[in-house]
Amino acid sequence: MPDTSSDARLTAALRAGGHRVTAQRLVLHRVLQELGTHATAEEVLQAASPRLPGLSLPTVYASLDLLARLGVARRIDGAGAAALYDPRAEPHHHFACRSCGRVLDVDAEIDTGALASAARRGGLAVDGVDVTLRGLCPDCR
């Protein structure tokens, strides 16, 4: 059953950004929510293909990147790894397992403003702050 409040948020964000509300964008957002984890575009494509025959990987990337820009999903860029898309758009942090590559959510209050301020003092233009802890997950320890 589609999450109508999630659909409403996406619809409002698309319209506010001057974008069309399409069935494809709604389905891809729903699929990301249903996967409930940090998914690659390839995983989203695989899960969405039965509902959207003929869907292509470039289209999935473009749509997921748009969702991230609109603030209804998050894009997580890893060093040398495929981007992951997070259905949780609200601020939170991540833990990346260095053994299996799994990415987990970490709910903690961190003063990201202080991190951004320190970077700006160093002459850096900060667009956002993402904190990722690295180590071994419980399954790999």
What are these regions (language model features)?
Residues 4-18:
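Short, Lys/Arg-enriched N-terminal segment that forms or immediately precedes the first helix
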Residues 69-141:
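Non-DNA-binding regulatory cores of transcription-related proteins
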Residues 60-70:
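Basic amphipathic alpha-helical segments that dock to polyanions
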Residues 26-31:
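Pre-recognition alpha-helix immediately N-terminal to the DNA-recognition helix
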